[in-house]
């Protein structure tokens, strides 16, 4: 389980990212979420979420939300299981082999970062940056298919430096 505050900040970060990026895929996700808000309570929540994300749908706002989400995830963690496992194993690197946008690895990546263990992930497809939402949390290293994806990653995420991104060609990770 994770902190409700961390989850709320992560949702707002993802929503603000989509609104800032405003790709066709982001517009479609926005439309689908509007459609899913099919009760008065859900509609009100959706309106509040959209209204609060709009002022943050810019690079400075996204950076602020990233810092807040990181602090909330790190300081309000409800379990030390990942951190304890990493202390026992003492890995040189924590690699997220699941989808980069999957929330399955979020707590483990935050725990690794808190312990100073480098993190890495792979972008599985050319459209992951524009159709799947925000990468949360940010990693220390990224493996990408080609130079175009590398450049797009660096453009969308100004906090990522070029030396953190490695072009590996298309890969299948088992």
Protein language model regions, located:
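Conserved N-terminal ligand/cofactor-binding loop architecture of enzyme catalytic domains
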Residues: 1-83, 88
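A nucleotide-sugar donor-handling region in carbohydrate enzymes
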Residues: 73-75, 137-174
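Active-site proximal beta-strand in glycosyltransferases
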Residues: 93, 97-98, 106-125
């Amino acid at each position: 389980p994770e902190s409700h505050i961390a989850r709320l900040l992560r949702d707002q970060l993802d929503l603000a990212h989509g609104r800032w990026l405003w790709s066709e895929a982001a517009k479609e996700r926005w439309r689908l979420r509007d459609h899913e808000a099919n009760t008065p309570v859900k509609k009100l929540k959706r309106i509040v979420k959209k209204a609060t994300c709009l002022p943050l749908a810019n690079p400075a706002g996204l950076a602020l939300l990233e810092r807040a989400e990181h602090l909330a995830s790190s300081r309000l963690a409800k379990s030390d299981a990942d951190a304890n496992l990493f202390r026992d194993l003492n890995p040189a690197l924590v690699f997220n082999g699941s989808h980069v946008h999957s929330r399955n690895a979020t707590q483990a990546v935050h725990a690794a970062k808190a312990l100073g263990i480098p993190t890495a992930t792979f972008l599985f497809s050319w459209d992951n940056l524009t159709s799947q939402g925000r990468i949360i949390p940010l990693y220390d290293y990224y493996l990408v298919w080609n130079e175009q994806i590398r450049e797009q990653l660096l453009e969308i995420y100004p906090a990522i430096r070029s030396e953190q991104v490695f072009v590996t060609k298309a890969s299948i990770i088992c």
